Amino acid sequence: MKKYAYILLILASVSTMATAQIKIGNYSFKDGSEYTGELKGRKPNGKGKTVFKNGDIYEGQYVKGKREGDGTYTFHDGEKYVGQWYQDQQHGNGTFYFMNNNRYEGMWYTDYQQGEGTMYYYNGDIYVGNWSQDQRSGKGTYTWKAGAQYVGEWKNDKKNGEGA
């Protein structure tokens, strides 16, 4: 019985130490942006919200003061990114909602549409395929609203070759 009581005491101590490191508070970034949320030490770490000086808002995960994990960034002009972050950059799987009502769903790498992704254009057209630094690049299929398609290679955001 004493053995179990001792184990419970150790577990309670470890649990208290772990939660004592994370607290809720505010943090001011050097650029004047204001953060409210979980802090570890004096830096954002965990869930929180930052209101940037220009009116942009980020709500999501932080690690050691940087956006990392899942989060939503709403730009002051109405555009929005919902997805994964790494080292303060859009990185991983995410969706970007453009002001002109286009929507990109797919992979991101250091703030660029990179890898497999789909662009839904405001006029009903759809592109499914590879992206490189925000441009259609490699294999992809563009389908016009009326049903016609181009299936083939892309380079510098333009059809490259005959395609099908």
Residue locations for each model-derived region?
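N-terminal segments that cap or nucleate solenoid repeat domains
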Residues: 20-57
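Sec-dependent N-terminal signal peptides
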Residues: 4-14
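Conserved anchor residues at repeat-unit boundaries in beta-strand-based tandem repeats, strongest
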Residues: 34-44, 57-68, 80-91, 103-114, ...
